[in-house]
């Protein structure tokens, strides 16, 4: 077993260039970036990809594909969360960062295989997927079928513990059934978004989806006289 220090050192090895180019996306003092059908991800793939690391950085994380990449802090916190809930054997990373070409392929293959209604519920339009940020991860139960679009992620066992402790490590279940009218996406128990622990704690406590939360931050910032906040898109 690696020590926590060694793991962090691994990530920090990848992070050297990041220190010179601070990344506003996951800093607690900035609003988490909002990506949805009304807010496409507009950053260049080169910039986004410079912040990614492969999940195989942590040899004991199970993944559907060793090439899956996540933003480095998101990956490091995912590793810590999986350790904390004893999820390294029972939980598999099914999807992470996707570029525009990959989301386009997923979108149209789902249209062909699953039809328009299903696709509209579970697959974001190319350019409008949180997976473009590297800050979203789909996880599935190793005991389930590991369906690529909708993996099983039950409420019990390691998956239940993962969900219960996700906010502590900075993750939120992004798409909940009762927020569908705001997110435009159906309930996805498997899709977690990294926003950082301070934001995740407030979102959890006040039952806010990201659309609601960034709007509250924007209003508070405007009230405080900082003008319009920028969310990076
Ligand atoms: Zn997802």
PLM regions: where:
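Extracytoplasmic cell-surface/polysaccharide-interacting catalytic and binding patches
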Residues: 1-96, 100-233
């Amino acid at each position: 077993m690696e020590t926590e220090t060694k793991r962090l050192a691994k990530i920090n090895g990848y992070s050297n260039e990041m220190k010179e180019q601070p990344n506003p996306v996951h800093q607690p003092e900035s609003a988490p970036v909002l990506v949805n059908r009304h807010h496409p991800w507009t950053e260049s793939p080169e910039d986004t990809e410079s912040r990614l690391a492969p999940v195989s950085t942590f040899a004991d994380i199970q993944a559907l594909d060793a090439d899956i990449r996540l933003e480095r802090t998101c990956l490091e916190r995912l590793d810590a969360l999986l350790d904390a809930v004893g999820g390294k054997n029972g939980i598999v990373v099914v999807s992470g960062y996707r570029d525009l070409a990959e989301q386009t392929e997923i979108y149209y293959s789902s249209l062909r295989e699953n039809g328009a209604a299903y696709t509209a519920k579970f697959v974001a339009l190319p350019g409008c997927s949180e997976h473009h940020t590297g800050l979203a991860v789909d996880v599935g139960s190793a005991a389930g079928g590991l369906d690529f679009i909708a993996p099983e992620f039950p409420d019990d066992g390691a998956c239940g513990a993962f969900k219960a402790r996700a906010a502590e490590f900075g993750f939120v279940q992004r798409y909940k059934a009762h927020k569908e009218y705001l997110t435009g996406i159906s309930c996805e128990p498997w899709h977690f978004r990294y926003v950082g622990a301070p934001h995740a704690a407030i979102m959890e406590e006040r039952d806010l989806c990201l659309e609601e939360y960034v709007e509250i931050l924007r209003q508070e910032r405007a009230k405080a006289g900082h003008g319009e906040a920028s969310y990076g898109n």
